[in-house]
Amino acid sequence: MRTLILLTTLLLLALHTQAESPQGSTKEAPDEEQDISVFFGGDKGTALQDAAVKAGVTCSCRTSSCRFGERLSGACRLNGRIYRLCC
């Protein structure tokens, strides 16, 4: 359990650092939503993914903060950049 909390904290810290770093010009609008594939690794990841599908959870990869009713669920990588995974 402690390991999971530590890994989650490190992931969020890396995501926060990535969000604050100066970004070069992008070809996409900052608030544009992208269709992505989200993969969870390992046996527990499969259980998490199955639970999300059963619950009807919709996740989006966002450049800015999560919208009302969404919460930060992790990070996603798109075209080599890391974004917020909001569900």
UniProtKB/Swiss-Prot annotation:
Q: Which residues form the propeptide?
A: 20-58
The transmembrane residues are none
Keyword flag Secreted: yes
Query: What name goes with this protein?
Result: Neutrophil antibiotic peptide NP-3B
Q: Which PROSITE patterns match?
A: DEFENSIN
Question: Keyword Signal: yes or no?
Answer: yes
Q: Which organism is it from?
A: Rattus norvegicus
Q: Coiled-coil region(s) at which residues?
A: none
- InterPro entries in the record: Alpha-defensin (IPR016327), Alpha-defensin_C (IPR006081), Alpha-defensin_N (IPR002366), Beta/alpha-defensin_C (IPR006080)
One of its GO biological process terms is:
defense response to Gram-negative bacterium
Keyword annotations = Antibiotic, Antimicrobial, Defensin, Disulfide bond, Fungicide, Secreted, Signal
The UniProt function text for this chain reads:
Active in vitro against S.aureus, fungi, Gram-positive and Gram-negative bacteria and to a lesser extent against an enveloped virus.
Which pairs of Cys residues are joined through disulfide bonds in the record?
A: C59-C87, C61-C76, C66-C86
